[in-house]
């Protein structure tokens, strides 16, 4: 694609990714971070959030690895912390409102930072120790000192799509996934999922 000057496009419609209002990535594994940057580059979207001045596209990250967001903070406009079923619709409604009223990206981010579970990296100044470890994140622009993760209180009542738009290609391992519960009642100290998906939730 890069050699032929073909920008990354949506499988379903063929529309260029850079023309979307929001581009979202699930950070499932740390080793996929370079793939995220490669996709942004293929799409013709500037990699760093500071280089993207217009309101859209908003580049959003989320998923399990968002519990440690700093390695990718400079590339994301917003990062979803916690469970995204309810937060996603709130953010999309806000983005639609800002786009229709002609507001800037800065105004969108200043409103989004007040949504529980939304971390806006550009509103925090990081400082590091001599050994390279993070010393502090200092909030700016009135951002909260602590960003609390989003929690779905009732998995049976939260929004979930009834039908999915899926690409017309073979799926990985030819399998389907059904979530019957989230998290774990055991809380083993070595297990990330047992802690980041608390409190335990069940879908019936």
PLM segments and residue spans:
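Active-site loop ensemble at the mouth of alpha/beta enzyme cores that anchors a bound cofactor
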Residues: 127-162
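Homeobox/homeodomain signature
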Residues: 7-13, 69, 108, 145-148, ...
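Radical SAM [4Fe-4S] cluster-binding motif and immediate context
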Residues: 152-204
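Generic structural "secondary-structure junction" signal
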Residues: 47, 67, 120, 149, ...
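Short, exposed beta-strand "edge-strand" segments with a Pro/Gly-rich flavor and a Y/T-containing core
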Residues: 12-14, 97, 101-102, 146-152, ...
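Glycine-rich beta-alpha loop elements in corrinoid/cobalamin-binding modules
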Residues: 2-138
């Amino acid at each position: 694609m890069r050699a032929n000057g073909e920008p990354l496009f949506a499988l379903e419609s063929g529309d260029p990714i850079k023309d979307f209002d929001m581009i979202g990535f699930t950070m499932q594994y740390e080793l996929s971070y370079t793939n995220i940057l490669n996709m942004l580059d293929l799409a013709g979207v500037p990699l760093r959030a500071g280089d993207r001045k217009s309101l859209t596209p908003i580049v959003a990250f989320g998923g399990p690895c968002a519990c440690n967001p700093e390695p990718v903070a400079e590339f994301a406009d917003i990062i979803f912390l916690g469970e995204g079923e309810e937060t996603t619709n709130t953010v999309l409604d806000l983005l639609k409102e800002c786009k229709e009223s002609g507001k800037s990206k800065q105004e969108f981010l200043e409103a989004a930072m007040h949504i529980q579970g939304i971390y806006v990296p550009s509103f925090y100044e990081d400082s590091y120790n001599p050994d390279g470890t993070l010393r502090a994140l200092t909030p700016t622009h009135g951002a909260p000192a602590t960003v609390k993760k989003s929690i779905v209180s009732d998995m049976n009542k939260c929004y979930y799509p009834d039908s999915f738009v899926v690409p017309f290609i073979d799926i990985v391992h030819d399998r389907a996934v059904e979530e019957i519960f989230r998290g774990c009642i055991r809380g083993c100290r070595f297990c990330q999922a047992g802690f980041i998906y608390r409190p335990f939730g069940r879908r019936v």
